[in-house]
From Swiss-Prot:
N-terminal signal peptide: 1-25
Keyword field contains tRNA processing: no
Molecular-function GO terms, alphabetical: calcitonin receptor binding; hormone activity
InterPro entries: Calcitonin-like, Calcitonin/adrenomedullin, Calcitonin_CS, Calcitonin_gene-rel_peptide, Calcitonin_peptide-like
Protein name stated in the entry: Calcitonin receptor-stimulating peptide 1
Zinc recorded as keyword: no
Protein encoded by which gene: CRSP1
Keywords associated with the record: Cleavage on pair of basic residues, Disulfide bond, Receptor, Secreted, Signal
Family: Belongs to the calcitonin family.
Organism: Bos taurus (Bovine)
GO terms for cellular component: extracellular space
Cited Pfam families: Calc_CGRP_IAPP
Disulfide bonds: 81-86
Maturation-removed propeptide residues: 26-77
């Protein structure tokens, strides 16, 4: 039964490939058929073209400088941390990073209630 479905598919695929080959044989042409030759421009057109190129260049440089200022401003803002909240967060981060070192180096390993004068048990009761 599947054999009867195969030939129409084969014919359809050959037709599609043939049409694709026809479109490929005649490619679309661009707006400019030849290369751009600046020698064919008169003086006014060349001045207008130069002004447009300079304007585009200035706009590109302005966008780049604005982008650089935005990223530079955010870096400066992150480095300058003078508010109380920011300093508290920095101190908390520093303490959490150094806490494991303090615990391992300065505190005794066997800490119990007797070290800090905890409740004593009398043996005579």
């Amino acid at each position: 039964m599947g054999f009867w479905k195969f030939p129409p598919f084969l014919v359809l695929s050959i037709l599609v490939l043939y049409q694709a080959g026809m479109f490929h044989a005649a490619p679309f042409r661009s707006v400019f058929d030849g290369r751009f030759d600046p020698a064919t421009l008169d003086e006014e057109e060349s001045r207008l073209l130069l002004a447009a190129m300079v304007n585009d260049y200035e706009q590109m440089r302005a966008r780049e400088s604005e982008k650089a200022q935005k990223t530079e401003g955010s870096r400066i803002q992150k480095r300058a941390c003078n508010t109380a909240t920011c300093m508290t967060h920095r101190l908390a981060g520093w303490l959490s990073r150094s806490g494991s070192m303090v615990r391992s180096n300065l505190l005794p390993t066997k800490m119990g209630f007797k070290i800090f004068n905890g409740p004593r048990r009398n043996s005579w009761f």
